[in-house]
Amino acid sequence: SVALNVSLDYLLKGEKENFILTLPEGNLTVKTDKGDFKGILGTYHTLFHSTVPKEEKWLQGELELVADAESRCKAEYRLDTGQRDSSGEAIYKCYTGQAIASKRLPVLYIILGNAQMGELCFVELRYRAFHTRDMECRMGLVLTTASGDERLPDIHKMLLFRNQINDETLETMKELLQIVNS
């Protein structure tokens, strides 16, 4: 909590914030009642490599995409930091925002923010509406701020999946999530 400059209580419980953009109707949509988010809404597990330089740790979280009261696609993300407080409870970072679907490009944008930490995260993933089943898995690219002492801009790959994955598949996916510098 000291590194993030927030209270431990905030990291444990989070805070509801409003990071909803107002977009004109057109080539981008946030509306869940028009079929653009069919098969997309629901809860996803996430996996990505730690953004702390030289730290060999994989982080997991949970992303919920739900329709809000105005039929916009609201996003809530809860990231398990892998750390524990003094009573042994897991410490989470919580973000809120929204998902935006492009009607012209095969891209879903998820914009997440945490006002208390002063942080925004942008997730892009391949998109299409699903008419006969739900989206099960996607790999996305994330633009965010690194954790740790430096807190510099950072990119990483993120895996989103609905159902838990067995350990063998998880290890294979970790290899695909690496970004190799050349």
Question: At which residue positions do the language-model features occur?
Answer:
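Short, charged recognition helix plus adjacent turn
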Residues: 13-38
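Short glycine/proline-enriched turns and hinge-like loops at secondary-structure junctions
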Residues: 55-59, 90, 121
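A contiguous binding-surface segment within folded domains or other stable secondary-structure elements
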Residues: 65-113
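C-terminal regulatory/effector modules of DNA-binding transcriptional regulators
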Residues: 93-182
